[in-house]
């Protein structure tokens, strides 16, 4: 039976008290030595139950993620067979207070390992590392759940590297030619395998670590294995191939780690994993790390792990995102989302690294191509060769371009530090995908932002996602022109601060002359040009996001109104005030505020200016807005990911909104139209289709909505290589072509 380690609090002090009312033989499931404070990080709550008629006792250990080990505790990690304590009581509770983090320098690690960690700036353990350390050093099999981006690689890496280093003694064993691996790590993707390899190599450069995965030549991997290796990290498929080719022998493996075990199932590696485990030595230590625990993972643990200790840093809570990730959600349409995407990157990334996740490879190419006209962007997906993918990732890490558009191949295992922003271009297939996509930012305690793009008809689905993940979105409007100008100016100023003083000298005379002629206007013009705003930016609707349109807000005095407010009554009001506005009005949505009666609607910018010059009847107010108020929700009701019915694919009515170019539908009602519908039935019938496009046709936003679980993409055409590329190649620096088409690929 497995013990369980949960997470009730944040910190523990190196203190342990256990009451011992009786002295009985302890269980084989968990043995603790009480004369030495080796288990001080754990706050233990002992509960026992009898299995059938036997006397086997099953304890439950509860530990905090930030459990603390003192130096004395670390030195006393060995178990003692002399002290016994009672597990038969109903509850033996251990109280603990807050304490400080555990410093690497107090762990008595091998000097070479400690120095390597310090060079990397790793001075304290993260929660998952603290929770795993003691049982891992005891040799326990472990099942661990933790939030993404919390340092799981070093959680198993530090204790295993420590034991390998101590077993090798004077390191001569590390130099023995032809030695077989003692440490095996299985990962579901090439990217995760390479990340684990990098962590181990940087932490223990004196160990020979080899990473094996598909998509590259066998020769180099086989040669490395032949020379002798201490650690093998790889994907199950390639490891099976190497075993069958007799290049990889696992007869001396002492430590096994399955990283992201739940994803092994997702990518179809379950049979390969079980085949590998069947061929490993029975006497070994195994650790399984998984964000979720599907049936296959539980079965795997029962069959191949020996009395595993469950370390759960997520528990029953829904929230699985790392701390420090700010979540936003924004409603878009299929025709406007690419323009909005560029604006979101400008405002929220603030010049930092951004990863945009798409559902399909075609979308990744299209979005990357569209963004590249204004932002340095590259795509990453399964059709790109492994060599090209590695070069693209390295260039992204080095800042040669700032936006990476990727499919879910990049949502797990990518080692990309300092990602400031993650954007979900469509709703993900399920909550777990959302968590792991978002986990590319806010890693290792840093802050980051994630933005979810959705259509108006998917609003309730977003609410379902909030409940399933246990998170909260801040619903935002598209960035305004003012937001773009301010953010762009800030980024240009930051760029100017990086100009070398010697370069400034060459332009000082010209700058002085311009200043004398134009004053600060000269600098303002330079900032505008560098920001990409040589021409004034055009207005944009907050509802449809169409350029050249603006959004107005109409508020009426309920004391002077009759009946209910509806889209039809708004059109009637506009008809009386300015008939042209009624003919050209776009989307209309009612405001979701019981304290007022109001609506927002779209108009072409010039017509809106003319409308605002009209005299508005007393008791009503009409204004142009830059941020949307809460609107009545007319989205589909469903909590089932990927299982929406056909009716959910169209926005629902209810009078909440109407199509643009409302024609004269309501104009003939005259001023009484503003009085509203006389009854609820009339209001329902007037709603029709909730959101129409101008000209009376149905909105593309309704037919092309991305739904969770849906695999269809927008109806735009696939990108053509004949199409002009507006960015610059990050290899040669020249414009007009991508890195994949660069004629200068020497060393690429």
UniProtKB/Swiss-Prot annotation:
Residues 652-668 have a biased composition (Gly residues). Residues 133-311 form the Helicase ATP-binding domain. One of its GO terms (biological process) is chloroplast organization. GO terms for molecular function: ATP binding; ATP hydrolysis activity; mRNA binding; RNA helicase activity; zinc ion binding. Nuclear genome-encoded factor involved in ribosome biogenesis in chloroplasts. Binds specific group II introns in chloroplasts and facilitates their splicing. Is required for rRNA maturation in plastids and may contribute to the assembly of the large (50S) ribosomal subunit. Required for normal development of chloroplasts. Required for the expression of transcripts encoding plastid-localized enzymes involved in abscisic acid (ABA) biosynthesis. Required for maintenance of ABA levels and response to salt stress. Possesses RNA chaperone activity for proper splicing of introns in chloroplasts. The Q motif is unique to and characteristic of the DEAD box family of RNA helicases and controls ATP binding and hydrolysis. This is DEAD-box ATP-dependent RNA helicase 3, chloroplastic.
């Amino acid at each position: 039976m497995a013990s369980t380690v949960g997470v009730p609090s944040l910190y523990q002090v190196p203190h342990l008290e256990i009451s011992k009312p009786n002295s009985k033989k302890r269980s084989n499931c968990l043995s603790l030595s009480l004369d030495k404070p080796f288990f001080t990080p754990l706050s233990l709550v002992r509960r026992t139950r009898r299995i059938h008629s036997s006397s086997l006792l099953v304890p439950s250990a509860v530990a905090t993620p930030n459990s603390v080990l003192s130096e004395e505790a670390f030195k006393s990690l060995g178990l003692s067979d002399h002290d016994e304590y009672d597990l038969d009581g109903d509850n033996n509770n251990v109280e603990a207070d807050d304490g400080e983090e555990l410093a690497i320098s107090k762990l008595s690690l091998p000097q070479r390992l400690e120095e390597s960690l310090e060079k990397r700036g790793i001075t304290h353990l993260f929660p998952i590392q603290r929770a795993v350390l003691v049982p891992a050093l005891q040799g326990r099999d472990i099942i661990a759940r933790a939030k993404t981006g919390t340092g799981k690689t070093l959680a198993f890496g530090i204790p295993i590297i420590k034991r390998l280093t101590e077993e090798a003694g004077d390191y001569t064993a590390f130099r023995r030619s032809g030695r077989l691996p003692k440490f095996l790590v299985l990962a579901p993707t090439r990217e995760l395998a390479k990340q684990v390899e990098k962590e181990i190599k940087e932490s223990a450069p004196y160990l020979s670590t080899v990473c094996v995965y598909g998509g590259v030549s066998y020769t180099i991997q086989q040669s490395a294995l032949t020379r002798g290796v201490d650690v093998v990290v790889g994907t199950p498929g390639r490891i099976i191939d190497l075993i069958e080719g007799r290049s990889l022998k696992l007869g001396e493996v002492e430590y096994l780690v399955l990283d992201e075990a739940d994803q092994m199932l997702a990518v179809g590696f379950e049979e390969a994993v079980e085949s590998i485990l069947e061929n490993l030595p029975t006497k070994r230590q195994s650790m399984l790390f998984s964000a979720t625990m599907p049936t296959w993972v539980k079965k795997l643990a029962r069959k191949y792990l020996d009395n595993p200790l469950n370390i759960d840093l997520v528990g029953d809570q829904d929230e699985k995102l790392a701390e420090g990730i700010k979540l936003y959600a924004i409603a878009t349409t299929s025709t406007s989302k690419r323009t909005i995407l560029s604006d979101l990157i400008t405002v929220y990334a603030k010049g930092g690294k951004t990863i945009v996740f798409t559902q399909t490879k075609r979308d990744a190419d299209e979005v990357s191509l569209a963004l590249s006209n204004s932002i340095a962007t590259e795509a990453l997906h399964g059709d790109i060769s492994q060599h090209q993918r590695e070069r693209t990732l390295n260039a992204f890490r080095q800042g040669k371009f700032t936006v990476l558009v990727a499919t879910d191949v990049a949502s797990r295992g990518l080692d990309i530090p300092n990602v400031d922003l993650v954007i979900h271009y469509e709703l993900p297939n399920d909550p777990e995908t959302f968590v792991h996509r978002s986990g590319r930012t806010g890693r290792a305690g840093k802050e980051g932002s994630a933005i979810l793009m959705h259509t108006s008809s998917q609003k309730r689905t977003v609410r379902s996602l909030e409940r399933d993940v246990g998170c909260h979105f801040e619903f935002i409007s598209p960035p305004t022109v003012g937001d773009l100008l301010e953010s762009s100016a800030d980024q240009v100023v930051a760029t100017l601060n990086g100009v070398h003083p010697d370069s400034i000298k060459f332009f000082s005379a010209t700058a002085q002359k311009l200043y004398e002629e134009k004053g600060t206007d000269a600098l303002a013009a330079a900032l505008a040009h560098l920001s990409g705003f040589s021409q004034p930016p055009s207005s944009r609707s907050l509802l449809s996001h169409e350029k050249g349109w603006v959004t107005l807000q109409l508020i009426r005095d309920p004391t002077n109104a009759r009946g209910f407010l509806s889209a039809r009554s708004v059109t009637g009001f506009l008809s009386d005030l300015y008939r042209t506005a009624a003919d050209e009005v776009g989307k209309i949505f009612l405001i979701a505020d019981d304290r007022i009666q109001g609506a927002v609607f779209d108009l072409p910018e010039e017509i809106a200016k003319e409308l605002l010059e009209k005299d508005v009847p007393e008791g009503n107010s009409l204004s142009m807005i830059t941020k949307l108020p809460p609107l009545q929700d007319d989205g589909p009701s469903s909590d089932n990911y990927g299982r929406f019915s056909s009716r959910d694919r169209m926005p629902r009515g209810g009078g909440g909104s109407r199509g643009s170019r409302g024609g004269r539908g309501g104009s003939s009602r005259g001023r009484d139209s503003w009085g509203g519908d006389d009854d609820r039935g009339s209001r329902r019938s007037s709603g029709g289709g909730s959101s129409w496009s101008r000209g009376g046709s149905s909105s593309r936003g309704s037919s092309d909505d991305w739904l969770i679980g849906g695999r269809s993409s927008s109806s735009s055409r696939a990108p053509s290589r004949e199409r002009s590329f507006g960015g610059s190649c990050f290899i040669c620096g020249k414009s007009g072509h991508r890195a994949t088409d660069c004629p200068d690929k020497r060393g690429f």
